[in-house]
């Protein structure tokens, strides 16, 4: 298995399995001289960790991070930063019924056919448990981007199943377990999830992420375009089945006179492009949306096959998120931050001294 590293100059290599002794990552390429403590990382991990409400998995993991290397006297040294998170609440016996069968919609079948072996305990390497190290690495990236460029990366849930969540204010997001930007709709979301849980079923969600303060110029055309790398990173998140940047699929029905964001001396008139043109950041907000499929592990019996190819019925009994999208906001934020820091360093390496006579216009003319 070789696809375990994200990035070019700022790289993150994750390791571990859902029911192994620990999970973690090694970050390489972090600039030296940045203050960094475990508390900086723990704040983000606490936003993602399981067991925080009745609407997510009841697996109780503290997700306490340990910095093993790359930091001396509270400052990054420029050497690899190793982060470790110990697993403490595994219940592997819950998965005894799928040792010989494959869960529909999961990676069980494909991992088995590719590698000839699979860790059936909680999905092993394919588990969303492995997003915790990504969030840990994302905390490092967020801190550097904020301190070096004033970049802020924030996200929220914009849709839960059939329930749209209209944006009201960023301050609402941190006040509820759904990362909803609309406090008034939270009771409806809770009732929706309660009914879903009684049905033994699951549902998907849409998450929107915004990066503000990104300067013009980040991105490496043609094959490492900023939007291409963002899409790849987002599609690397468990259960993500779609990515939109800017207007996304709505662009299909827009005319060029509408979609093309006009430029004025005062700034851009619109942002249908989502802050990226030609694979390079424009200086506007970078806007990304992801579609997350329903959790595949549900209590409703489903048809499947055994390793021998015989018919079987699968019912999952482990502790699972009825909607993985509820905890996905910090993960999507982290993925965007990791792509941005990598491109910031790549831009600095090749084009850091480039200057033009054209003034950099504002992201918005209003």
Swiss-Prot record:
Which residues does FMN bind? 125-127, 238-239, 278, 293-297, 319
> What is the reaction catalyzed?
5-O-(1-carboxyvinyl)-3-phosphoshikimate = chorismate + phosphate
Tell me the PROSITE patterns matching this sequence: CHORISMATE_SYNTHASE_1, CHORISMATE_SYNTHASE_2, CHORISMATE_SYNTHASE_3
Q: What pathway does the UniProt record associate with this protein? A: Metabolic intermediate biosynthesis; chorismate biosynthesis; chorismate from D-erythrose 4-phosphate and phosphoenolpyruvate: step 7/7
Q: Which cofactor does it need?
A: FMNH2
Give the binding site residues for NADP(+): 48, 54
- What is the role of the protein in this entry? This reaction introduces a second double bond into the aromatic ring system.
Q: Which family does it belong to?
A: Belongs to the chorismate synthase family.
Its protein name is Chorismate synthase
Q: Identify the species of origin.
A: Burkholderia ambifaria (strain ATCC BAA-244 / DSM 16087 / CCUG 44356 / LMG 19182 / AMMD) (Burkholderia cepacia (strain AMMD))
The primary gene name is aroC
């Amino acid at each position: 298995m070789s696809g375990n590293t994200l990035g070019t100059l700022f790289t993150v290599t994750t390791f571990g399995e859902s029911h192994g002794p620990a999970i973690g990552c090694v970050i390489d390429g972090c600039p030296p001289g940045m203050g960094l403590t475990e508390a900086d990382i723990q704040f983000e991990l606490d936003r993602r960790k399981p067991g925080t409400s009745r609407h997510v998995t009841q697996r109780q993991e503290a997700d306490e991070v340990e910095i093993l290397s790359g930091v001396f006297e509270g400052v990054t040294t420029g050497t690899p930063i190793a982060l470790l998170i110990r697993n403490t609440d595994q219940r592997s016996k819950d998965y005894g019924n799928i040792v010989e069968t494959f869960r529909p919609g999961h990676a069980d079948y494909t991992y088995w056919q590719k590698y000839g072996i699979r860790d059936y305990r909680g999905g092993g390497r394919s588990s969303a448990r492995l997003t915790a190290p990504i969030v840990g690495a994302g905390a490092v990236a967020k801190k550097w981007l904020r301190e070096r460029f004033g970049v802020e990366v924030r996200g929220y849930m914009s849709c839960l199943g059939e329930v749209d969540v209209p944006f009201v204010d960023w301050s609402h997001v941190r006040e509820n377990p759904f990362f909803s930007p609309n406090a008034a709709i939270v009771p409806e979301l809770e009732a929706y999830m309660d009914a879903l849980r009684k049905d033994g079923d699951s549902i998907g969600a849409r998450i929107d992420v915004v990066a503000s303060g990104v300067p013009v110029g980040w991105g490496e055309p043609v094959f490492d375009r900023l939007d291409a790398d963002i899409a790849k990173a987002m599609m690397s998140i468990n259960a993500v089945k779609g990515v939109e940047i800017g207007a996304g699929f709505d662009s299909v029905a827009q005319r060029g006179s509408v979609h093309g964001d006009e430029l004025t001396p005062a700034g851009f008139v619109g942002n249908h492009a989502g802050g990226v043109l030609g694979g390079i950041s424009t200086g506007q907000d970078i806007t990304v949306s992801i579609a997350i499929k329903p959790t595949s592990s549900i209590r409703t019996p489903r048809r499947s096959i055994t390793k021998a190819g015989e018919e079987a019925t699968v019912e999952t009994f482990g502790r699972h998120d009825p909607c993985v999208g509820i905890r996905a906001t910090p993960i999507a934020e982290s993925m965007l931050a990791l792509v941005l820091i990598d491109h910031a360093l790549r831009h600095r390496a090749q084009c850091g001294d480039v200057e033009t006579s054209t003034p950099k216009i504002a992201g918005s003319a209003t």
